[in-house]
Amino acid sequence: MLETKFKVAFLLVVLAFAALPIMGILRGTIMTPYEEAPPVTEDALSELESATNEAPVPEEMVTIPAGPFVRGTTSGGFDEQPQRTIYVDTFSIDRYEVTNHQYQQFVAATGHRKPGPPSRYAKSIGRMRGTNQPVVYVSWDDANDYCRWKGKRLPTEAEWEKAMRGTDARLWPWGNQEKPNGANWARVQDGHEVSARVGSFPTDKSPYGVMDGAGNVMEWVADWYQETYYKDAPDKDPPSPEFGIFRVMRGGGYTTTGGDIRITSRSKMVPDFRDETIGFRCAISAIFRGSAS
């Protein structure tokens, strides 16, 4: 009997050590920053330079007036609760997600690194290169640097949510009823395998006229992620928590399904992460009075 127990214990130890490399691979797949991934091929990156001969969309901003709005939900994820009334000062936000054309101007002017995937994603980059498709494969720092170059900043979570849902606590930019083809998301026959030209879905338009909040690509915002922040944050202009491990992403995308397409849904990722589903837009703490270029 003792010998049998010893054999079982020894077998469990062997299995535990054998599992460690697998666990490491899983952790690496989820958490490894872009810089540790295989190098990007020049051929893959060059595809971004040959964007379609399409006139760039106008670089517009929308001013969101000061006032209260209802943030969060009563029935979503734990980190979306409780539902509370929050006051946000006047700000302006990009009407559209930042496009490839706009980001390429930034790269050309500053020498900032190009958006690009690890080699394992290289085949997909050709489908994301359109002039007016949202730029993707950008980290949180890339997005933040672009906004600063433009004299802007990333929107806070509170600003982003107000801009996309208005003041009446709606679940989607258009209202409270899900529309299968209302935005560019997964598992619908909308004619788009990947991201679409910004503004392609007229229904995906907030009460203020901000486009693509429910679909197309997810968007980096300014905040560090904190699970209980909807409960703990101040009632007026809640800033980002001071520190964290993950940065917040908001909005749905062309790979998004189910509850994640609601405007209240919160996602998170390490700041160095880059892939084809994440883009961004910028904001300013002022009224928009003209050209944003």
Give short role names for the model-derived ranges.
Residues 1-14:
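N-terminal Sec-pathway targeting helices
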Residues 15-27:
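Hydrophobic alpha-helical membrane-insertion segments, chiefly the h-region
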Residues 27-48, 55:
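Ser/Thr/Pro/Gly-rich low-complexity linker/stalk segments immediately outside membranes or between
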Residues 49-51, 78-83, 266-271:
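Short, P/G- and charge-enriched loop/turn segments at secondary-structure junctions
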Residues 53-118, 138-141, 215:
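A short glycine-rich, aromatic-capped structural motif
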Residues 62, 85, 171, 219, ...:
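Residues embedded in well-ordered beta-strands
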Residues 64, 70, 74-75, 118-265, ...:
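Functional-site microenvironments in short loops/helix caps that host divalent-cation chemistry
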Residues 276-290:
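Short, structured beta-strand segments at or near domain termini in extracellular proteins/domains
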